[in-house]
UniProtKB/Swiss-Prot annotation:
Readthrough of the terminator UAG occurs at position 246. GO terms for biological process: viral RNA genome replication. It catalyses: RNA(n) + a ribonucleoside 5'-triphosphate = RNA(n+1) + diphosphate. This is Probable RNA-directed RNA polymerase. Keywords: Nucleotide-binding, Nucleotidyltransferase, RNA suppression of termination, RNA-directed RNA polymerase, Transferase, Viral RNA replication. Residues 467-580 form the RdRp catalytic domain. Its EC number is 2.7.7.48. GO terms for molecular function: nucleotide binding; RNA binding; RNA-directed RNA polymerase activity. RNA-dependent RNA polymerase that plays an essential role in the virus replication. The keyword Nucleotide-binding applies. It is an enzyme of class 2 (transferase).
Length: 763
């Protein structure tokens, strides 16, 4: 192709491209003109719609609709003309029927919300939530979860179907988290001129000028000169009466039981007919929940009642009767469990006396060192197994029971404990692990922290599709341990020690007990067959062994047991509830025990184990004591406060232990932190921990928690466990932080009422 041809084609191509560009530009110009016309037309139409609708068309409509505006308007319209209707009247019952054996029977019942009465039903459950949570609620995550759970529970109580429950709960949440007419009227009243005038009048009275100023302002007033005369003669000036909050440190004397009844031929009584030596219970009542505690004196009257009612007799229909005995052959039925326990636990040998002594610290170590030394000079004797009985220095709640039977402690001699401890002290932990394996997971909650216990409960809970927990314990477990029960327990030990004759002789001393109890004003001498003697080396081990194996024998279903002596929680499927409840009480009675089963619970936080409940802190589970009980009980001390320094040392010890156990937990964290702040820089007294070697101090031994921010999930879980709403938690924490504990010991006074809301009767 030549050069001329290329030039011709180039000219033609340029002409065509230019033409196309011109056509495109013309088309864009035409479309722009049309767009301007359309825009102007829409503007005119929009202006016409705005004018004709009065501006209502400017409100953006949600694609999902906005029915809650009508709900709120309906509440405002009905607020002054409320017709009382129960939620059941606002729902419709639907019965699902089926034919069984030729007959039509009702298989299930459910309720649906009547669509014509939906708004009234929603307002009804919203009002219940308002009343429960205390009006206007802060919009926190914890409150959102708590209110949602509460509303869902109200729908479940009426058996509302899930779809309608979701619809009604979402609508009711709007009403709960917005102020209603009552709250608006209340705030309007508080902000009114009349209310302001009252506040000014009160402030003017409380802030009165001094008597000298009043005399200068009113020199002709006779009352002012009379007031001056009174002041000159040593009287106080005329001031408004104020009512300061009570609260401080004081002590209470020990108490005597007022009940004397019964007697037993095996008990020799010697009444000294003189006043008893009184114990003291020290109290701080600046921060408390209202429960009052006392301590029993170690006196003849208390010792007598404690022995008769906690060792020899049980109460039935307000009469003292002998303890029930197990059915003949009942413990022989459990021979297969003893053999299984032996296979899992294995054989063991006793440890040396020095190894046993090394297991203890402080004063108890010294006692056992001396006992071990005496055994080198003189072998164990029968009298070493005799009991030395005394009244336990224990705080008891007078609000729950004003005059309970005192608890007795019945230890044997340290020489006997050393000999038996050489067999059972180290063996005890192997026995617990064997019980764990028999039950298929951690079962005996000895030696665990509160977090570990809660985690074990959570793991057991998650092993079931529809879990339910049934708590149960045996009324006065130790008292109901019969000779047959002791013989079965001892046979488990002897199997693991290959029938050791010396161990058999030591255990035989527990079958027939000889004891004496000395008080400051009398004494008692007695003989008792069987019965667990609190103070024996094998008290905890024996109780756990019996509780775990008897329950395993009774429960022929898939289940998990959480145990700590006589305190038990059984977790299983909901379909097995009837089987468990019917077999627990009747089954345990065959072994001579009085089993008390609690109501089944279906939520983790509702479980009660050792007077604690599981609470989720946002990262994991931990066991938390009921604040209503713990904050009052930890306000009472069995350690003497001889001076202000001793009181501060006790406050610091309790506060630090409490923070290690309950750091990051609502309310109680601030309670223990206040103890630490009140103690200041006082030096710790390690003797206090030894004197107060209770479960509280032992729980804190391995705990590692501390003061930290409370998570929203923890507030919600705490509400689930104890019923204290998140807003109430925050309010109480602020109140605790504002209070001051006076560490000067003074006369007894009434407790401060700042934490009244924790009392269950107000909830």
């Amino acid at each position: 192709m030549g050069l001329p041809s290329l030039l011709v084609e180039g000219v033609i191509g340029c002409t065509l491209v230019g033409g196309l560009v011109a056509v495109g530009s013309a088309a864009l110009a035409v479309r722009a003109t049309i767009g301007v016309v359309e825009f102007n037309r829409e503007c005119v139409r929009g202006a016409r719609r705005i004018v004709s609708s009065g501006g209502r068309c400017l409100i953006v409509q949600s694609p999902y609709g906005n029915p809650n505006q009508g709900l709120i308007r309906g509440e405002d319209e009905e607020i002054d003309n409320v017709e009382e209707s129960t939620p059941e009247e606002l729902t419709q019952l639907i019965e699902v029927k089926a034919e069984v054996d030729g007959k039509e029977v009702v298989v299930s019942k459910k309720r649906v919300v009547n669509r014509h009465l939906r708004q009234r039903f929603v307002r009804s459950i919203a009002i219940e939530a308002k009343n429960h949570f205390g009006g206007d609620i802060s919009p926190s995550k914890a409150n959102y979860l708590s209110v949602s759970k509460f509303l869902t529970g109200k729908c479940k109580e009426r058996h509302v179907v899930p779809a309608h429950t979701r619809d009604c709960v979402s609508a009711a949440m709007v009403l709960v988290f917005t102020p209603d007419v009552h709250e608006i009227r209340m705030m309007a009243g508080l902000a009114s001129d009349a209310a302001y005038a009252r506040k000014i009048a009160m402030a003017s009275i409380l802030n009165r000028k001094g008597w000298c100023w009043r005399l200068m302002v009113n020199p002709l007033d006779r009352a002012r000169w009379w007031e001056m005369w009174c002041v000159v003669n040593g009287f106080d000036s005329n001031k408004p009466v104020t009512f300061p909050k009570x609260g401080g440190l004081f002590y209470l004397n020990g108490v005597e039981t007022k009940i004397r009844r019964g007697g037993h031929p095996s008990v020799i009584e010697v009444d000294g007919q003189c006043p008893p030596r009184e114990r003291k219970l020290y109290v701080q009542n600046a921060i408390t929940t209202g429960y009052e505690y006392r301590v029993h004196n170690h006196s003849y009257a208390n010792l007598r009642r404690g022995l008769l009612e906690r060792v020899f007799y049980v109460e039935r229909n307000k009469e003292l009767v002998s303890c029930p005995q197990p059915e003949p052959g009942s413990f022989k039925e459990m021979g297969y469990l003893r053999r299984r326990f032996h296979r899992v636990c294995g054989n063991h040998t006793r440890i040396s006396a020095n190894d046993l002594v090394d297991c203890y610290q402080g004063r108890k170590r010294t006692i056992y060192e001396n006992a071990a030394a005496s055994l080198l000079d003189r072998a164990i004797e029968r009298k070493d197994g005799d009991l030395k009985t005394f009244i336990k220095a224990e705080k008891f709640n007078v609000n729950l029971k004003s005059d309970p039977a005192p608890r007795v402690i019945q230890p044997r001699s340290p020489r006997y404990n050393v000999e038996l401890g050489r067999y059972l002290k180290k063996y005890e932990h192997h026995a617990y692990k064997a019980l764990d394996k028999i039950w298929g997971g951690p079962t005996v909650m000895k030696g665990y922290t509160t977090e570990e216990v809660a985690q074990h409960i959570w793991s057991a809970w998650n092993q079931f599709q529809t879990p339910v927990a049934i708590g149960f314990d045996m009324s006065r477990f130790d008292q109901h341990v019969s000779v047959a029960a002791l013989e079965f327990e001892h046979s488990c030990y002897l199997a693991c020690f290959e029938g050791d004759a010396h161990l058999a002789n030591l255990l035989k001393m527990q079958l027939v007990n000889h004891g004496v109890g000395f008080a400051s004003n009398g004494m008692l001498r007695y003989t008792k067959e069987g019965c667990r003697m609190i103070g024996d080396m094998n008290t905890a081990l024996g109780n756990c062994l019996l509780a775990c194996l008897i329950t395993k024998h009774l429960m022929k279903i898939r289940s998990r047991l959480i145990n700590n002596g006589d305190d038990c929680v059984l977790i299983c499927e909901r379909t097995d509830i009837d089987y468990v409840v019917s077999n627990l009480t009747t089954g345990w009675s065959r072994f001579g025990f009085n089993c008390i089963a609690e109501e089944p619970v279906y939520e983790m936080e509702k479980i009660r184990f050792c007077q604690m409940a599981p609470v989720f802190d946002g990262a994991g589970w931990l066991m938390v004591r009921d604040p209503l009980v713990s904050m009052s009980k930890d306000s009472h001390s069995l350690v003497h406060w001889n001076n202000e320094t001793n009181a501060k040392q006790w406050l610091k010890s309790v506060g630090m232990c409490g923070l290690r156990i309950a750091g990051g937990v609502p309310i109680v964290q601030e309670f223990y932190q206040k103890y630490v702040e009140t103690a200041g820089n006082v030096k710790e007294n390690k003797n206090i921990t030894e004197k107060s070697s209770s479960g509280f101090f032992m729980m804190a031994d391995r705990a590692k928690r501390g003061y930290s921010a409370v998570s929203e999930m923890c507030r919600f879980s705490f509400y689930q466990a104890f019923g204290i709403t998140p807003d109430q938690q925050i309010a109480l924490e602020g109140e605790i932080r504002s209070l001051t504990i006076d560490t000067n010991v003074g006369p007894q006074c009434e407790a401060a009422d700042s934490l009244w809301i924790l009392n269950r009767k107000y909830q």
